[in-house]
């Protein structure tokens, strides 16, 4: 009777014990990668140049976020995220301050899976 190869058994255990990242963890990670200082700057530029109201500015924010998300993860994974986000309402939503008629985006509101992120938390 031969003894089992311990090395193979250990490797199999390691592979079996590895768990994939939860979609919540992936959303948090991706949101932090997408919403950067540059991203917020571009949204604020749009707000000032086009004199957007809060509804238009929120729409612009989400369109830009989704375009960056699609570019970053590809269409298959993007569909998975948008389906999940639509079901659970986890899209990051902007926080705006109104400065005498023009909006400034200072960060994003927390959602079920995404922590609040402020402009000053982001790397310039």
Swiss-Prot record:
The DNLP motif has IFN suppressive functions like binding to host MAP1B. It holds the Pfam family RSV_NS2. InterPro entries: RSV_NS2 (IPR004336). GO terms for cellular component: host cell mitochondrion. Plays a major role in antagonizing the type I IFN-mediated antiviral response. Acts cooperatively with NS1 to repress activation and nuclear translocation of host IFN-regulatory factor IRF3. Interacts with the host cytoplasmic sensor of viral nucleic acids RIGI and prevents the interaction with its downstream partner MAVS. Together with NS2, participates in the proteasomal degradation of host STAT2, IRF3, IRF7, TBK1 and RIGI through a NS-degradasome involving CUL2 and Elongin-C. The degradasome requires an intact mitochondrial MAVS. Induces host SOCS1 expression. GO terms for biological process: symbiont-mediated perturbation of host apoptosis; symbiont-mediated suppression of host cytoplasmic pattern recognition receptor signaling pathway via inhibition of IRF3 activity; symbiont-mediated suppression of host cytoplasmic pattern recognition receptor signaling pathway via inhibition of IRF7 activity; symbiont-mediated suppression of host cytoplasmic pattern recognition receptor signaling pathway via inhibition of RIG-I activity; symbiont-mediated suppression of host cytoplasmic pattern recognition receptor signaling pathway via inhibition of TBK1 activity; symbiont-mediated suppression of host JAK-STAT cascade via inhibition of STAT2 activity; symbiont-mediated suppression of host toll-like receptor signaling pathway; symbiont-mediated suppression of host type I interferon-mediated signaling pathway. It is found in: Host mitochondrion. Its main location: host cell. Monomer (instable). Homomultimer. Heteromultimer with NS1. Interacts with host RIGI (via N-terminus); this interaction prevents host signaling pathway involved in interferon production. Interacts with host MAP1B/microtubule-associated protein 1B. This is Non-structural protein 2. A motif (DLNP) lies at residues 121-124. Keywords: Host mitochondrion, Host-virus interaction, Inhibition of host innate immune response by virus, Inhibition of host interferon signaling pathway by virus, Inhibition of host IRF3 by virus, Inhibition of host IRF7 by virus, Inhibition of host RIG-I by virus, Inhibition of host RLR pathway by virus, Inhibition of host STAT2 by virus, Inhibition of host TBK1 by virus, Inhibition of host TLR pathway by virus, Interferon antiviral system evasion, Modulation of host cell apoptosis by virus, Viral immunoevasion. Belongs to the pneumovirus non-structural protein 2 family.
């Amino acid at each position: 009777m031969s003894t089992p190869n311990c090395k193979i058994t250990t490797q199999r255990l390691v592979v079996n014990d590895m768990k994939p990242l939860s979609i919540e963890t992936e959303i948090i990670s991706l949101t932090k990668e997408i919403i950067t200082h540059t991203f917020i700057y571009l949204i604020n530029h749009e707000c000032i140049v086009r004199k957007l109201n809060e509804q238009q500015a929120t729409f612009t924010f989400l369109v830009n976020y989704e375009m960056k998300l699609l570019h970053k993860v590809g269409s298959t994974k993007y569909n998975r995220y948008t389906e999940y986000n639509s079901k659970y309402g986890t899209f990051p939503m902007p926080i705006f301050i109104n400065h005498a008629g023009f909006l400034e985006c200072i960060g994003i509101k927390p959602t079920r899976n995404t922590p609040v992120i402020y402009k000053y938390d982001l790397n310039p």
